Amino acid sequence: MISQICNEVIGLVPKKEEPGWLSVTGHPGAVYCENSISSGPEATGADVSQAIRIAYFTPLKHIPGPWYASLTGLRLSWSVFANNRIHYVHSLHQKYGPIVRIGPQEIDVADPVAGREIHRMGSGFMKAPFYELLSPGPVDNIFNFRDPKLHAARRKLYARGFTLQSLRNEWEPKVRDIIKLTVEKIKCDAVKGEAEIMGWWTLMANEIVCQLTFGGGAGIVAKGVKEPFVLMLERRMGDLAHLLKHFAPPGYYLGRALAWFIPPLQDIFYSQERMFAAGGDVVSRAREAKKAQAEPRNLFNKALEAGNLTDTDIITDAGALLLAGSDPTAISLTFLLWCVLSRPEVQKQVEAEVATLEGELTDEACERLPILNAVIDESLRLYGAAPGCMPRSPPSGGVTIGGYFIPDDTIVATQNWSLQRNPSIWDDADTFDHTRWLSNSRITDQAKLAFNPFGYGARQCLGIHLGRMEMRLAAAMFFRECVGARLGRSVTDESMHVVDSFIAGVPRDRRCAITLT
């Protein structure tokens, strides 16, 4: 019974060989109940023997960490449910060093050389099974493919649409118009009282990604309402049913049965069907645009020309691209403005620099502004939207990392929060200091290896150039149009404390207000 409670409530499932269950070893904070010492009548001698063997008689015994981490993942799981996993793991690195054991069969690495080796193309490391959770639909998507070959083939379909030159040639005018309207909305609210910038940046990013991927989302910022598909997608990824289906299938199927008699439960247990119904518009727009040869051509228009995608592939990939391209951009811009507006002297420098730009802003011109790009990079270093773990499975036969042999049944994770705040790499690591990016001598080779706010290698964020374009144009436009903006009274260091929300780091209050009054 205790093992079942651990599996169903805390976040683990039985072993792979048990039928009807999906193993999610590698879930951030997973509790390895099958490898932990149980209690009660089910705590057999074999259970205890297995837990002791893994804790003290495998190569992982040499890796430093708290004594309990070798026996149980309960403490790590608690940090996940308390939304502070990044802070907990970071505290372990501060105490035990760059390579630390955080669970019976999980380690975290905060060494930049080792991190690059883990994530480089051809390293043999694969995304951990945890990523199987991150699909809004019944098939894998561009984000959660574990097989490198499948991922490479799908990525190739979309890659040319995300090159910097392609974005500037085809999409920059549209992106600029959406950002311009967003800044106007923010300024209007701020003049009247306060503007909640995180909400506006989210709508802006939603509209840009919808437009670019499948040609939808027109008017999201103007109307102040998200695309129906986006709303269904967010509900799908955040609902109880999505987790129950993977962690406790009996509860999932019971919920679906009860939903026939309790209609409100249908929003929870039939969210996938409703998401796909809303996704019909995504498919029709993508395929119609291909026939019409619309300009600019959206991402799926180009992908359908280069390869075969089913309707399910389109909807599932659209969901993944929207999730990866909306909230992270909004979160990053929110923290960027908070960092700058908290420092009036830095704010004046940025305002003075963007004021030198004449006429309509262009991404190319913004890219040449040293102070603007320095504050962007420094905010991404400290408050990038993806500070949490990136779990990987080692190649067959195991691998040596930082002098330690790691068996192939271990989960090896890295987290940007620790790599980008490592005091042995960064001077005053926890201090916002944009000037470090204005001098090449202060960004060492180690720092270059450690700075990966958009991920590594072949798995680097597909939309890195779009994300940076949005940040440059939005920040430049904001500081040119909203000179003298101040943070709202409700904004404090505590309200902006980073909460580790599953796969993103968000402000505790999930909002940030600014004013021009």
From Swiss-Prot:
Keywords: Heme, Iron, Metal-binding, Monooxygenase, Oxidoreductase, Virulence. Its EC number is 1.14.-.-. Its cofactor is heme. Induction: The genes forming the sterigmatocystin biosynthesis cluster are co-regulated and induced on oatmeal porridge or the fungal isolates were grown either on oatmeal porridge or in YEC medium (0.2% yeast extract, 5.0% corn steep liquor). Expression is positively regulated by the cluster-specific transcription factor aflR that binds the palindromic sequence 5'-TCG(N5)CGA-3'found in the promoter. It comes from the Eukaryota. Disulfide bonds: none annotated. Coiled coil: none annotated. Pathway: Mycotoxin biosynthesis; sterigmatocystin biosynthesis. One of its GO terms (molecular function) is monooxygenase activity. Gene3D superfamilies: Cytochrome P450 (1.10.630.10). Disruption phenotype: Impairs the production of sterigmatocystin and leads to the accumulation of averufin. GO terms for biological process: sterigmatocystin biosynthetic process. Heme binds at C461. InterPro entries: Cyt_P450, Cyt_P450_CS, Cyt_P450_E_grp-I, Cyt_P450_sf, Cytochrome_P450_monoxygenase. Pfam families: p450 (PF00067). Belongs to the cytochrome P450 family. PANTHER family: CYTOCHROME P450 (PTHR24305), CYTOCHROME P450 MONOOXYGENASE STCB-RELATED (PTHR24305:SF96). Cytochrome P450 monooxygenase; part of the gene cluster that mediates the biosynthesis of sterigmatocystin (ST), a polyketide-derived furanocoumarin which is part of the most toxic and carcinogenic compounds among the known mycotoxins. The first step in the biosynthesis of sterigmatocystin is the production of hexanoate by the fatty acid synthase (FAS) units stcJ and stcK. The polyketide backbone is assembled by the non-reducing polyketide synthase stcA by condensation of the starter hexanoyl-CoA and 7 malonyl-CoA extender units followed by cyclization and release of norsolorinic acid. This is Cytochrome P450 monooxygenase stcB. The gene is stcB.
